[in-house]
Amino acid sequence: MPREIITIQVGQCGNQIGMEFWKQLCLEHGIGKDGLLEDFATQGGDRKDVFFYQADDQHYIPRALLVDLEPRVINGIQNSEYRNLYNHENIFVAEHGGGAGNNWASGYHQGEQVVDDIMDMIDREADGSDSLEGFVLCHSIAGGTGSGMGSYLLETLNDRYSKKLVQTYSVFPNQMETSDVVVQPYNSLLTLKRLTLNADCVVVLDNTALNRIAVERLHLANPTFAQTNSLVSTVMSASTTTLRYPGYMNNDLVGLLASLIPTPRCHFLMTGYTPLTVERQVNMIRKTTVLDVMRRLLQTKNIMVSSYARNKEASQAKYISILNIIQGEVDPTQVHESLQRIRERKLVNFIEWGPASIQVALSRKSPYVQTTHRVSGLMLANHTSIRHLFSKCLGQYEKLRKKQAFLDNYRKFPMFEDNDLSEFDESREIIESLVDEYKACESPDYIKWGMEDAGEANVAAALDSKLVV
């Protein structure tokens, strides 16, 4: 029985990456822009109903909600070639359409005011599922709607659907460019608190790294949002292939995540992908082997999260877990030999308190998407160096907070009125604790460190409790 997943796209960024994701899924399953199955899509074996359901006229509709506080991006989707794909009852745009003004507090407050309308949509989708497994939230952490309203929805989902998994694809801002959102550090910190406490898994999509990959690997001088969004949709679709083309393992979300997240708080994943699309067009077609793909996935230049670690810290960073999803014509003996070669060459530095092995899931490719390579791979990895990304967010927050800069923007809203800034302080403490825990993971004594935290034992079965019988 398929375990359905409902996708919730929040804000400008969330809806843009969500749209690219659905385009990719339609291509891979032979579904036309109007939701009707293409005449050539005659091969079975795929599970469309994890992400789609069929209307009475047999056309496929995404299990998706499109939510925004200003209409521009959603209007663009409704005027695009894909306008008939979505269920229009699942589109929410705020009546005033003024957006959140890149202010987390505004997005959160407006989320409180409209949550009943949005939860009605979510409940309706959930009731239409035979065996709902969970939710996927697409958003950014730096603006107003995706961060603030996304945070409120995360808390509400956690409360209302406590037994269901919540996974997010969270876009982190580009740290190499001057942001036009001056309060970005405040928004990011407040959102990170909710991602730590209210999500079961966060796939970190770091715009800094995505831009670097687009420039260095894809040879694009000035990557556009559309080009970096296509990288994101590649990662999102590849990370769901084992759910949509089921094999013996990792064919549901809880199985996928349980292998990657051994400890509840450390649930932030980084990704790597090879070979990349435009790269194949620029260079000559190369021979792709399982070993070649698996080795490339471990190279820093292919990893889609920037590490701000200094040299010494970088050498101490360790993998907590790795899952490689390999697509294409693959012989399992090649996988075994590749793993052996990687072990012999000591290419991976694992933690000392857990299973030190790369897990591999084999998945077939879509028969409807032609590629020039035989094998491609996605790496989902839990790696301690991600703490440096959080430390960077903390450092930027401290700079603004010391100057008491732009706090009046937040004091206008109920959570911060009467100059109550305790929400900032609490968020900072939670992220500092997260950084400390990722650092502790590098030590062989981490298990003891976990026991010192009184609440940890109670949370340890968090993922297990979401195994719905």
Curated annotation (Swiss-Prot):
Family named by the database record: Belongs to the tubulin family.
Biological role: Tubulin is the major constituent of microtubules. The gamma chain is found at microtubule organizing centers (MTOC) such as the spindle poles, suggesting that it is involved in the minus-end nucleation of microtubule assembly.
GO molecular function annotations of the record: GTP binding; microtubule nucleator activity
Main location: cytoplasm
Keywords: Cytoplasm, Cytoskeleton, GTP-binding, Microtubule, Nucleotide-binding
Spans traversing the lipid bilayer: none
Subcellular location: Cytoplasm, Cytoskeleton, Microtubule organizing center
CDD domains noted in UniProt: gamma_tubulin
InterPro entries: Gamma_tubulin, Tub_FtsZ_C, Tubulin, Tubulin/FtsZ-like_C, Tubulin/FtsZ_2-layer-sand-dom, Tubulin/FtsZ_GTPase_sf, Tubulin_C, Tubulin_CS
PANTHER family: TUBULIN (PTHR11588)
Protein name in the entry: Tubulin gamma-2 chain
GO CC terms of this entry: cytoplasm; gamma-tubulin ring complex; microtubule; nucleus; spindle
Protein's GO biological process: cytoplasmic microtubule organization; meiotic spindle organization; microtubule nucleation; mitotic cell cycle; mitotic sister chromatid segregation; mitotic spindle organization
